[in-house]
């Protein structure tokens, strides 16, 4: 289930229709507003890295009333995007969602989203992490920014004090993680990378699929690296539907 808000414009209607066509349930219909739907211009360089120029649009109006508490209560995991802390309303939404999750034993996961978000809104992110998130997703740049260090080993130790479970992705090098007891290092998968846009989302989605199906966090990380390696070989953040079935079939 995806909770978000979009305007009743071409981009917003397309987004909601795309969610529906991919069998992702959602609560809020497009809103009639003078504020446009959020948009993001993604520029991809020859090394497959991407730079984003984002207009949050009506997303800055996302409010606690847009949450569906019953959906959160019925979920195994609540997944929050760190981008939400960029607006005061988004921050309140995150806190309310975590409170609802904690009341119903729904586990909380959060993505730090972007090193610029971490640098600009570290206090806000810390507030959310202090609410005892069960699982943190971040890449190496985000981890270093949050820990205020240039040594990933130091950052790793700091994250062990923050959350019982976390995963730090390292691009083509794979990822490192901690599951509350064990540290692990998952090697990357060699691939001809074209576009890294969507790799982090694919990784997080694959991990959450695994652990909510009963697998360990380490196995989830292995699957996450495998799935992410498939999306970076294509232009754009998503694959066609059939490719997702192939990824699951080939891995499991």
PLM ranges: what are they?
Residues 39-43, 51, 174-178:
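Short beta-strand scaffold segments in enzyme catalytic cores
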Residues 26, 108-109, 166:
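Hydrophobic beta-strand scaffold residues
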Residues 23, 57-64, 115-120, 148-149:
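Short gly/ser/thr-rich secondary-structure transition/capping motifs
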Residues 27-31, 42-88:
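Conserved phosphate-binding/catalytic loop of the ribokinase/pfkB sugar-kinase fold
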Residues 69-73, 129-130, 160:
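A short, aliphatic-rich alpha-helical micro-motif
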Residues 1-39, 56, 250-252:
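Substrate-binding N-lobe of the ribokinase-like
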Residues 77-157, 173-175:
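Conserved beta-alpha-beta core of the PfkB/ribokinase-like small-molecule kinase fold
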Residues 99-103, 123, 148, 152-252:
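Conserved phosphate-binding/catalytic region of the ribokinase-like
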